[in-house]
Regions:
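Conserved helix-turn-beta segment of the N-terminal RecA-like "Helicase ATP-binding" lobe
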Residues: 32-62, 159-163, 325
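Conserved helix/coil segment N-terminal to the catalytic DExD/H
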Residues: 62-80, 85-104
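SF2 helicase/translocase ATPase core recognition
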Residues: 36, 134-170, 217-244, 358, ...
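Conserved P-loop NTPase motor "coupling/switch" region that bridges the ATPase
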Residues: 22-23, 43, 49-53, 106-107, ...
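Loop/turn-to-beta-strand initiation segments
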Residues: 77-80, 105-107, 135-138, 355-359
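Conserved Helicase C-terminal RecA-like lobe
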Residues: 1-29, 88, 219-371
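Substrate-gripping "pore-loop 1 plus following alpha2 helix"
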Residues: 95-102, 106, 115-130
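Walker B catalytic acidic pair
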Residues: 111-112
Length: 373
């Protein structure tokens, strides 16, 4: 990474030493929030500060409740609550965070702040409301603009609405986007046609943000992209052709809505991956050459390897194939079906130079951002 976490921890320590805060809430996605508890804060917090740090979990017990209550004990300790952003969509998580803030001078920090980019989302509104009670607010992200410059509105608004100069998202949108009208099924809809005044927006950001690129702080070799072409098997080709014809027939003469088109595209993609999920939830296996080519590739490279796959079915097959070829202790897994605590252990195992774990296998939905490997 670029050191975002250390900068935040250092800033938290400075504010604590100056008596500005005595509490902090770190909010991060479920897939990465445990990193703050096990790595980021223990590794970077100044040694003279001995915090009372509690990790939020969905499960409750007498022991866990006692941990939570320790955050409200009086004294001079820095109290830190680490909570996943999904928990702030629940009444229980939101109420506890609000109680914590009422009892502390708090710094509220959002890691991967694109999780609050949607101004109409219930979670975004809850976090913006919560942020108003914080003494200090911070955001961190590796990609502040994921789809549109308009993603910046609520992220910056969380810090302070005056920073961009707009209390209304629609006024902000009209300033920086050209809208066009479209009719869908008799409904008039406004869509973004293009963007404008982006230099002005960039200048505003410079006044209150700090941006660093990996090239500025890491000595990494350039990425090398190599395309490996894998031929479809006869079985795949027939299935693909049949599915393509069926999809075209289904959509012919109809208004092609995005969900319909995406469903057909996903089915075609599944066929190229070597399987097809049927309407009843069962999966049909389709003979393919991908795993054989993957093993050939792994035989050619040395050192650690990260393998991403979109579908759990593919991950399971990749895990079995690599286990058979290189041994079960050569892999760690990171996707939704793996318990959160095990995921964190798998990261540490993969990072350990003395570990036999050579292959990190996961899906980008769970591990595609926010973790440092």
């Amino acid at each position: 990474g670029t050191g975002k976490s250390k900068v935040l921890v250092d800033n938290m320590a400075m504010l604590y030493d100056k008596g500005k805060i005595n509490g902090a809430i770190i909010v991060a996605p479920k897939g990465v929030y445990r990193n703050w508890y096990s790595q980021e804060i223990p590794n970077h917090l100044a040694s003279h500060i001995q915090p009372k740090m509690v990790l939020w979990t969905a499960l409750t017990s007498k022991t866990k409740d006692k941990e939570y209550q320790s955050l409200f004990e009086t004294g001079h300790d820095l109290h830190i609550l680490i909570i996943n952003v999904e928990a702030l969509s629940t009444k229980k998580g939101l109420d506890f965070a609000a109680k914590f803030m009422r009892c502390h001078k708090t710094m509220l920090a959002i890691d991967e702040s694109t999780t609050i980019k949607n101004p109409s989302a219930k979670r975004t509104k809850s976090i913006l409301s919560l942020g108003k009670e914080a003494t200090y607010r911070r955001i961190l992200t590796g990609s502040p603009v994921t789809k549109s410059p308009l993603d910046l509105y609520t992220q910056c608004g969380f810090l302070n609405s005056y920073l961009l100069g707009y209390d209304s998202f629609y006024a902000f949108r009209n300033r920086y986007a050209n809208m066009i009208d479209r009719n869908f099924g008799g409904r008039r809809v406004q869509l973004i046609g293009s963007y404008k005044r982006l230099d002005e927006l960039a200048d505003k950001l410079k006044g209150f943000s700090y941006r660093v690129l990996k090239d500025d702080c890491l000595d990494l070799p350039d990425k090398v992209y190599i395309r490996r072409e894998v031929d479809l098997t006869d079985e795949q080709s027939k299935a693909y052709s049949t599915m393509k014809s069926a999809a075209l027939a289904l959509l012919k003469g109809k208004m092609a809505t995005a969900p319909h088109v995406l469903t057909q595209m996903m089915r075609l993609h599944q066929i190229t991956c070597g399987h097809l999920r049927n309407d009843d939830g069962t999966i049909t296996e389709i003979k393919n050459n991908r795993l054989k080519e993957l093993v050939n590739l792994l035989d050619e490279v040395e050192g650690k390897v990260i393998i991403w796959a979109n579908y759990v079915h593919d991950i399971e097959h990749i895990v079995k194939t690599i286990s058979d070829e290189f041994g079960s202790d050569s892999i760690v897994q990171y996707y939704g079906a793996i318990p959160a605590e095990q995921r964190q252990q798998n990261i540490e195992k993969f990072q350990d130079p003395n570990s036999k774990a050579r292959f990190f296998i996961g899906n980008p939905q769970t591990g595609g951002y926010g973790i440092t490997l």
